[in-house]
Amino acid sequence: MPIQEIRHPLIRHKLGLLRRAEISTKNFRELAQEVTMLLTYEATKDLQLVDHEIDGWVGKVKTQRIAGKKITIVPILRAGIGMLEGVLNLIPSAKVSVLGLERDEETLEARTYYKKLVPDVANRIAMIIDPMLATGSSLIAAIDVLKASGCKDIRVMVLVAAPEGVKKVQAKHPEVEIYTASIDDGLNEHGYIVPGLGDAGDKIFGSVQKD
């Protein structure tokens, strides 16, 4: 199914800690990375395996290793950077592509202001990471960029998602699988996810304004 809400007990517990109003930058970063690792486990369950033989301590040992398409991780600036280490902890050999998106104040649509994709991105599984799927505009723009670059297998990992954004993305890109720790209640009048996490970018980079 295109949208998968992963309700593993560890994810539910760590997500509850992430939602606290009073949380340090250090704790938010660590928890975001931990939840990302758990989402990565789910998002990669269908990777191809091939039989492989190695030299073990008692001689030849039959094992398996990942084969097929290689992976590129695609963090959306800036908040997506906060999830990057969580993926790399499990897939340290993955290449990283970067997309910068911002809202055009005239059209209110997302536009690309930075793009640095690996040269062979079309031949890789592209895993987009961004803490929040709110209105869906940024994610749709990111998927559009990757498809225009030849990507055929695109997956998305977000910490929390709003139903409005999920519906919008699925209408435009129904084949793209989305993995999230929570489908929240919805968006408020300002376009923020409720209950959400607050401004994930500010919390990850320590730029939260104090009263």
UniProtKB/Swiss-Prot annotation:
HAMAP family xref list: Upp_B (MF_01218_B)
SUPFAM superfamilies listed in its UniProt record: PRTase-like
Pathway: Pyrimidine metabolism; UMP biosynthesis via salvage pathway; UMP from uracil: step 1/1
Name of the protein in its database record: Uracil phosphoribosyltransferase
Cofactors required: Mg(2+)
Record's signal peptide: none
Molecular function GO labels: GTP binding; magnesium ion binding; uracil phosphoribosyltransferase activity
Catalysed conversion reaction: UMP + diphosphate = 5-phospho-alpha-D-ribose 1-diphosphate + uracil
InterPro entries: PRibTrfase_dom, PRTase-like, Upp_B, UPRTase/APRTase, Ura_phspho_trans
Positions bound to uracil: I193, G198, D199, A200
Regulation affecting activity: Allosterically activated by GTP.
Family: Belongs to the UPRTase family.
Annotated binding of 5-phospho-alpha-D-ribose 1-diphosphate, by residue: R78, R103, D130, P131, M132, L133, A134, T135, G136, S137, S138, D199
Keyword Amino-acid biosynthesis: no
One BP term from GO: UMP salvage
Cofactor binding remark: Binds 1 Mg(2+) ion per subunit. The magnesium is bound as Mg-PRPP.
Known role: Catalyzes the conversion of uracil and 5-phospho-alpha-D-ribose 1-diphosphate (PRPP) to UMP and diphosphate.
